[in-house]
Regions:
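N-terminal secretory signal peptides that target proteins for export/translocation
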Residues: 1-9
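Bacterial N-terminal signal peptides
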Residues: 8-20
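Preference for long, amphipathic alpha-helical scaffolds in soluble/luminal domains
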Residues: 22-332
Length: 332
């Protein structure tokens, strides 16, 4: 009488074990694909980032800070990078003289140069904060934060610089995003009255909720909610997940086709929530990236400016590739 039951139990156990092994095999394959994609991208980030420095001889908000952030993420995840070059250019990027072409250095000073490079400064800070101790280059990083605070607008916002105001979204949304990134680079510090006041004013500016139009707005707002310990982080996470496209990715603009920029941003934001909470969404996004990468390690990304007319551009491709690497490294 007991034999059929025993056979049934054995069959169930074998079936369960088979399914488990299959799931582990699929997961291992997915992880391998992610690793291959990251490894392929590292030389692209190094080569094209150094080419930009050689040609322009300066840092920019989208190029050098994201070279450093992407390579820091890859290094932290255990991938090989040129550590000597990374350290050299990380140090070089912290000096205000590096934020402009050397031809203009004699006509500028720190204050005037910082005014047009707030975006550069907060991305330089964010690209280091996850991967090194607070003591590393503490004085220089403190100076960058002081300069960011000094360039806050009267209404509490931080003005987007360079080409950012020309992006394909309302200027108000771009300004809110710039203010969110600035706040993320200025974590709360009770013994810094100037920073505390700047944060208060910036948060007041952000009280006006906009209808999310870009993955960057949703991701940056989610990251800020997490920094604040705000209960709205759960709602923001649901908004981000609901915007995921059928192919697993996100567009930089939510009503557009998936690209590496929006997808990398979304992955990074989800990794800060808890990457164990949303494995399906993360897995789908990873598969979108691993299946759409170019042979040279990049991901072609449509330009974010109106003048790009939706066509891939060198700067947006580099920016998006760096975000893809960051997102993949943080969720692998």
């Amino acid at each position: 009488m007991c034999k059929p039951i025993g056979l049934a139990v054995g069959f169930v156990a074998i079936t369960w074990l088979t399914q488990l092994l299959f799931a582990l095999e699929v997961r291992a394959e997915a992880e391998t694909d992610v690793d291959v994609a990251i490894q392929r991208s590292v030389p692209f980030l190094e080569r094209e980032g150094l080419a930009w420095i050689g040609k322009r001889q300066c840092v920019s908000c989208h190029q050098v800070p994201f070279m450093l952030w992407g390579l820091n993420a890859a290094k932290n995840a255990g991938f090989g990078v040129d550590e000597a070059s990374l350290a050299k250019h990380a140090d070089w990027s912290l000096t205000w003289q590096s934020w402009q072409n050397p031809k203009n250095a004699s006509e500028s000073d720190e204050a005037s140069t910082a005014k047009g490079n707030v975006d550069t400064m907060y991305f330089l800070l964010l690209g280091r904060s996850d991967y090194e101790s607070n003591e590393t280059k503490a004085d220089q990083k403190a100076n960058l934060r002081r300069l960011i605070v000094a360039n806050q607008q009267a209404d509490g916002s931080f003005k987007p610089g360079g080409q950012l105001p020309k992006q394909r979204r309302p200027l108000e949304a771009t300004t809110q995003v710039a203010t969110m990134w600035a706040l993320l680079a200025l974590p709360p510090r009770e013994d810094d009255a100037d920073r505390s006041e700047a944060r208060r004013k910036a948060l007041e500016f952000l009280e006006k909720e906009l209808t999310p139009a870009s993955a960057e707005w949703v991701a940056a707002r989610l990251l800020l909610d997490l920094q604040l310990g705000d209960a709205k982080a759960a709602e923001r996470t649901r908004t981000l997940l609901a915007a995921q496209n059928e192919d697993g990715g996100w567009g930089w603009l939510l009503n557009e086709q998936s690209d590496a920029f929006g997808t990398g941003l979304a992955l990074y934001a989800l990794s800060q929530v808890d990457k164990q909470e949303h494995p399906d969404a993360i897995g789908r996004a990873q598969r979108f990236l691993t299946s759409s990468q170019a042979e040279d390690g990049s991901w072609p990304v449509p330009g974010t400016k109106q003048t790009a007319q939706g066509k891939p551009r060198e700067t947006s491709t580099y920016w998006g590739t760096a975000w893809a690497v960051i997102g993949l490294c943080e969720t692998r």
